[in-house]
Regions:
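Zinc-dependent deaminase catalytic domain
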Residues: 1-123
Length: 125
């Protein structure tokens, strides 16, 4: 991490990842403007209104078609409340998949920050 603020936002993303009910993968995302103001947040989970019962969460054939990644949820939340993410930075607990990287670019995110493998090895969740 480059400074104490980067670490704070990564720590917050890890906190948000704990909100995910997915038993196997927990990812959090915090999108921050140039003024260090939080613009949006997200964690991986099912869309609003979709039951997140244990059967769906543990059956990959049922889970994967429905699950929204943390980055997607942060982008969709910002769109829902009318907040532009253009020029912002996304802090994510894990390197984005190619689909999320594409979505972050399309949303105008200028930078993505995530822990290095060495930093991840020091984190105990």
């Amino acid at each position: 991490m480059s400074d104490k603020w980067d670490q704070r936002f990564i720590d917050l993303a890890f906190h948000l990842s704990g909100w995910s009910k997915d038993p196997s993968t927990k990812v959090g995302c915090v999108v921050v403007g140039e003024d260090r103001e939080i613009r949006s947040t997200g964690f991986n989970g099912f869309p609003r209104g979709i039951s997140d019962d244990n059967e769906r969460l543990t059956d990959r054939a049922k889970k994967y078609p429905l699950i929204c990644h943390a980055e997607e949820n942060a982008i969709m939340h910002a769109a829902r409340i009318g907040v532009s993410l253009k020029g912002n930075t996304a802090f994510v607990t894990w390197p984005p998949c190619s689909r999320c990287a594409r979505s972050l670019i399309q949303a105008g995110i200028r930078e993505v920050v995530y822990p290095t493998p060495q930093e991840l090895s020091l984190i105990h969740i």
